[in-house]
Amino acid sequence: MLPLLRAIWQADAAFPSGAFAFSYGIEGALALRPDMSLGEFERLCAAVLQQRWASYDRIALQRAFRAGRDLDALAAVDREIEASTMIEALRAGSRRNGASFLAAHARLGQPLALKLRAQVKAGDCLGHIAVMQGAIWAALQLDEQHAALCSAYTVASGLITAAVRLGAVGALQGQSVLQALLPLIDALVATPLDDDAELESFIPILDIAAARHVHAELRLFAN
Amino acid sequence: MLHALRQAKAQATATVAARVGIGGPVGSGKTALIEALIPVLQRRGVDFAVVTNDLVTKEDAERLRRSGLIDPDRVSAVEAGACPHTVIREDPTLNIAAGDELEARFPGVELILFESGGDNLASTFSLDLVDWWIFVIDVAGGDDIPRKRGPGLLRCDLLVVNKIDLAPHVGVDLDRMLADARQVRGGKPVIATNLKAGTGVEAVADAISAAVLFRI
Ligand SMILES: Nc1nc2c(ncn2[C@@H]2O[C@H](COP(=O)(O)OP(=O)(O)O)[C@@H](O)[C@H]2O)c(=O)[nH]1
Ligand SMILES: [Mg+2]
């Protein structure tokens, strides 16, 4: 049961990792579509999971998880994310979230987190969140599938928390969306991943919204 | 051997800046306090940087950067995700990382000031993030504020009561407000300031120096 408990620990929103400040583009999307219905919001969350998480974050997460303590391999996945994320706001957000996540684990004394933090400091590694999660969760001995569940769940619950805080959906409406997304997360994680899968992400409304968000006068979330 | 150890320890501590939080309600004068402290700290030769936690984009960071008082690169902005409480208390990791990043960029930095985005009297700083923290209230908020015993006001290391120039205009009995504040804080320090005129700023700088820079 310990691997499962560790995954619950890492998926818990109470674990301080900076994730609460990132809206995964939702803030920008809601600014473009302020009258979004709950159904549309749910479809948007599903699209994030299918078209960004499953084809992008998950691949980076798994590669990092398998790279384990190999710092060069981790840096390579990290560079690939940097090169393939077109939108600067998402790139910078992913690095900042990664830095916060590392700061938490470094403060907890996790040896790999201390090494990775030094690498980021020295500029040898950029520290994208999916890569840091994969590496640290492997070091913390989570099970690989649990790590994927944990990653997808934190993205879904992060989207919902952001929408609740922006006043776009109610706290319980948000939980009904999250509940409806659980089978999708389960199915996505159950689908095996090719070793040579390429990182791909394209969600027009979120990409456009995130790109516009950088210039927004009034914004609460970092992306 | 002992000498080498001491030297290593001195080096290790030399790279770690003291971290000081500045919290308090929106509009109480947190940014104004930083603006007033900047020239005083500079005159005292303190090597410092600032992290702001704006609720809305980077307003305070931009205000400090444009002030011409400080090298704009020494001001970092953390967006608080609509949660000014969370970013200094439940999840201070964004701020911790921003502080680490400033330390890496400015190796000699001795002091990092963290300005909270500001919210109500309940906000407190996590001691994971800061070594010592200030809470700023202002007289225009009313002289009953100390008696409301908010955790921010009670637990901070230094309470600053700002805008004392406004006391006569808002019908506040300043002496009584300060006495109440000292009483509910059990004698922990309280400093009255008028940041428009610079009153009390040296005393705040003295308190910071004594508490975390070990200079008197
Ligand atoms: N009269 C007076 N106004 C002040 C004083 N300190 C700050 N202010 C004004 O109060 C407003 C809010 O100050 P600011 O520093 O932005 O507050 P913050 O939200 O706590 O950072 C600004 O318009 C300041 O000029 C003071 O001591 N006296
Ligand atoms: Mg301010």
From Swiss-Prot, chain B:
One of its GO terms (biological process) is urea catabolic process. One of its GO terms (cellular component) is cytoplasm. Homodimer. UreD, UreF and UreG form a complex that acts as a GTP-hydrolysis-dependent molecular chaperone, activating the urease apoprotein by helping to assemble the nickel containing metallocenter of UreC. The UreE protein probably delivers the nickel. Facilitates the functional incorporation of the urease nickel metallocenter. This process requires GTP hydrolysis, probably effectuated by UreG. HAMAP family: UreG (MF_01389). GTP binds at residues 24-31. Gene3D superfamilies: P-loop containing nucleotide triphosphate hydrolases (3.40.50.300). It comes from Bradyrhizobium sp. (strain BTAi1 / ATCC BAA-1182). This is Urease accessory protein UreG 1. Belongs to the SIMIBI class G3E GTPase family. UreG subfamily. GO terms for molecular function: GTP binding; GTPase activity; nickel cation binding. PANTHER family: UREASE ACCESSORY PROTEIN G. It is found in: Cytoplasm. It comes from the Bacteria.
